[in-house]
């Protein structure tokens, strides 16, 4: 296998390993590492937990420091190794100490604390460093992290459940409260896994008033996102379940809300821009929008969205609130059947241009039997 072909092969493996940390690394980037000697992987690792071992450490701790294979090994790291003391020591120093002669990096880290210094440190120690910048797979892998650093806002994912006849909210009696599901249980479980991937989850006041959702991840593993409610007219109840979250945020609201709820001033610019600005300033890298048609249309009209996941259930509702229309130019990344349901993945063309491209999606959970 030619060296360039081998480099790409092992880097693709590092990218795949990095995805193992997608639920617990935020606000850090996702990083994978493969240590290769000859044509064999001798160790693999990934950054699994914010504040925990970085990918290089996770891989190298599987090998004895005196392992002779390290003297001819190549370390494939999906993102430039860090060169600063944070919650963990610099990964550059460990690579140097272990005597690895060659390091292949998926992309340079734009974080100002790194920004090429890791590559310089390794080269200064006599290590051959190959940088595969232009690897858009690496940019897509860390699109949340990069959006915060390069665009100054969280990555925005919109999710909508749609009936086959085009409705997003089935008819219900006025006094009924609680969600009336359009999709089946397996897809709702997948939605909870999507929630765990994002740092915040946003809904409108209507969703809270009608459904009183918990917006948690009870059917999946991973951290619960910070709930954000758009409530400019103070419609939501202080006893709503979302306000039990210790970091709950509301744009608007009223004075009767629990004291711990962060209330954003409605005079501080347009609603969506104001909320995204607040989330960015608090270190939030991504937000999942599960609001109703009015809220989703607001994001479409503002242009401040990146991905849209349209989940079509199996049964027509015969009426209700029409689902939002996807903007002209939205790029279909892929479509998957999921049990009785069907999921379509779209990306904002401007977001696709910024990332470089949008790879075909993979589902976060196994397909139901």
Tell where the protein language model's regions lie, with residue ranges.
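Enzymes that bind and transform nitrogen-containing heteroaromatic metabolites
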Residues: 2-29, 87, 155-369
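A broad detector of short, well-ordered amphipathic alpha-helices
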Residues: 12, 16-19, 43, 54-57, ...
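Helix-turn-helix
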Residues: 32
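Zn2+-dependent cytidine deaminase-like catalytic core
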Residues: 35-137, 300
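Active-site beta-strand termini and strand-to-loop segments that position acidic
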Residues: 37-38, 150-151, 347-349
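Structured loop/turn residues at beta-strand edges in well-structured enzyme cores
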Residues: 68-71, 98, 151, 196, ...
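Flexible, polar/acidic helix-loop-strand segments at domain edges
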Residues: 142-153
């Amino acid at each position: 296998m030619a060296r360039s072909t081998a480099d790409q092969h092992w880097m693709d493996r590092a990218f795949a390993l990095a995805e193992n940390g997608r639920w617990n690394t935020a606000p850090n980037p996702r990083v994978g590492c493969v240590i290769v000697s000859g044509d064999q992987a001798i160790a693999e690792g990934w950054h699994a937990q914010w504040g925990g071992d970085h990918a290089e450490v996770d891989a190298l701790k599987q090998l004895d420091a005196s392992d002779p294979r390290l003297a001819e090994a190549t370390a494939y790291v999906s993102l430039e190794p860090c060169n600063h003391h944070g919650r963990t020591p610099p990964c550059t120093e460990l690579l140097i100490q272990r005597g690895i002669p060659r390091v292949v990096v998926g992309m340079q880290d734009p974080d100002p604390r790194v920004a090429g210094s890791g590559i310089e440190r390794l080269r200064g120690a006599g290590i051959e460093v190959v940088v595969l910048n232009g690897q858009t797979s690496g940019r897509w892998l860390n699109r949340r992290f990069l959006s915060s650093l390069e665009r100054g806002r969280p990555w925005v994912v919109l999710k909508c459940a749609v009936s086959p006849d085009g409705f997003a909210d089935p008819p219900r009696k006025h006094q009924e409260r609680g969600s009336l599901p359009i999709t089946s249980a397996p897809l709702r479980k997948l939605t909870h896994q999507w929630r765990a991937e994002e740092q915040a989850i946003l809904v409108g006041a209507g969703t809270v008033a009608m459904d009183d959702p918990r917006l948690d991840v009870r059917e999946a593993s991973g951290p619960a996102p910070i709930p954000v409610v758009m409530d400019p007219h103070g419609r939501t109840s202080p006893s709503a379940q979302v306000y039990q979250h210790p970091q709950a945020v509301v744009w608007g609201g009223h004075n009767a809300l629990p004291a711990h709820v962060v209330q954003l001033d409605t005079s501080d610019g347009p609603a969506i821009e104001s909320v995204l600005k607040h989330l960015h300033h608090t270190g939030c890298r991504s937000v999942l929008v599960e609001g109703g048609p009015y809220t989703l249309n607001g994001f479409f009209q503002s242009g401040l969205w990146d991905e849209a996941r349209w989940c079509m259930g199996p049964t027509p509702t015969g009426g209700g609130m029409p689902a939002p229309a996807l903007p002209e130019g939205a790029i279909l990344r892929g479509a998957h059947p999921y049990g009785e349901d069907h999921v379509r993945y779209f990306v904002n063309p401007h977001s696709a241009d910024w990332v470089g491209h949008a790879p075909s999606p993979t589902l976060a959970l196994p397909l139901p039997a």
